[in-house]
From Swiss-Prot:
GO terms for molecular function: S-adenosylmethionine:tRNA ribosyltransferase-isomerase activity. Its main location: cytoplasm. This is S-adenosylmethionine:tRNA ribosyltransferase-isomerase. HAMAP family: QueA. It comes from Exiguobacterium sibiricum (strain DSM 17290 / CCUG 55495 / CIP 109462 / JCM 13490 / 255-15). Its EC number is 2.4.99.17. GO terms for cellular component: cytoplasm. The gene is queA. One of its GO terms (biological process) is tRNA wobble guanine modification.
Length: 347
């Protein structure tokens, strides 16, 4: 399958640079995943599309202040570092800029030595494995020294760092936010639970690979980055009961979807599970774990728009994206949302 089949024209001015003041005031495009019929709403209207007995699956990962600015201890040369994922105690896969200055044995210092790191391996893809040393608790030191790693297409400074976190973020570990969740507020979640909707949290730590373009012409040849996930038994039980009782499972975001599909494919049912997943979902594959998906509008030719197309059809999704451009929707991380559902849109 040609990657160019997932291309579309997006005016640069429709890439959202800042979040809206009210998380729930973003536009919401409701799309019937089977017919392609669509309707324009506001995100706070999404409550009306849920029924008692449905379950909303949320990714409770928390974005780390993973961008660090420091120096080489030997020369004082400036280094920018981005933490990608933890591989063992105090050991992280990172991106260093400029990478050529960071070789095995190089020692880096951040915050006048409050945090130090030694390069232990240079990876083939340009990444660097670093072992950190510090006094106290690592994440407290990181909170003090690090800054939020915004996506490369966002050029504005983010005044309130919490706006790049979901209101239910709990588990530290992501290099990027699961952005579909940014639309929810505690009040909106309460309105859903008051209606009889259950929440099923899981964790998938989002890596920067989510922003990497597909570099091959043939979609089938693309290799996904791996990300760590956990589905707790408490949530797995809710999901099993939802299916048993005829309720719908609605995933918030592609990260929740990839986690559920990983568990279903590996275990055949919703069970407690954890590990690393590099699952790549694109048209031609059946998505078994969810009935609906809440997601943002994604980059052209990205693995994310391919996943969304797998839940519907490529033609329906590209039509919806053309409509979003025509209706001046805001795109990407701080942009508007789509709700893919089987609901008839003739009411």
């Amino acid at each position: 399958m040609d990657v160019n089949l997932f291309d579309f024209h997006l005016p640069e001015e429709q890439i959202a640079q800042v979040p809206l003041l009210d998380r729930t005031s973003s536009k919401l495009m409701v799309v019937n995943r089977e017919t392609g019929a669509l309707r324009h709403e506001k995100f706070h209207d999404i409550v009306s599309y849920f029924n008692a007995g449905d379950t909303l699956v949320i990714n409770d990962t928390k974005v780390l202040p993973a961008r660090l600015f420091g120096v080489k201890e030997e020369t004082g040369g400036k280094i920018e570092l981005l933490l990608l994922k933890q591989t063992s105690d105090d050991v992280w896969e990172t991106l260093a800029k400029p990478a050529k200055r960071v070789k095995p044995g190089t020692v880096l210092s951040f915050g006048d030595g409050l945090l130090r790191a030694e390069c232990v391996e240079a990876l083939d893809d340009g990444g660097r494995i670093l072992k950190f040393s510090y006094t106290g608790i690592f994440y407290e030191v990181l909170d003090q020294l690090g800054t939020m790693p915004l996506p490369p297409y966002i050029h504005e400074q983010l005044e309130d760092q919490d706006r790049y976190q979901t209101v239910y973020a709990r588990e530290r570990g992501s290099a990027a936010a699961p952005t579909a969740g940014l639309h929810f507020t505690p009040e909106l979640l309460q309105a859903l639970t008051d209606k009889g909707v259950q929440l099923a949290p899981l964790t998938l730590h989002v890596g920067l690979g989510t922003f990497r373009p597909v570099s091959v012409d043939d979609v089938d040849s693309h290799k996904m980055h791996s990300e760590y996930y956990e589905l707790p038994e408490s949530s797995a039980k809710i999901l099993r009961e939802t299916r048993k009782n005829g309720g719908r499972i609605i995933a918030v975001g592609t990260t929740s979807t990839r986690t559920l599909e990983t568990v279903i494919r590996d275990h055949g049912d919703f069970v407690e599970a954890s590990g690393w997943t590099d699952i790549f979902i694109y048209p031609g594959q059946e998505i078994k774990g969810i009935d609906g998906l809440i997601t943002n509008f994604h980059l052209p030719k990205s693995t994310l728009i391919m996943l969304v197309s797998a839940l519907s059809t490529r033609e329906h999704i590209l039509h919806a994206y053309e409509e979003a451009v025509a209706q001046n929707y805001r795109f990407f991380s701080f942009g508007d949302a789509m709700f893919l559902t089987r609901e008839e849109l003739n009411r």
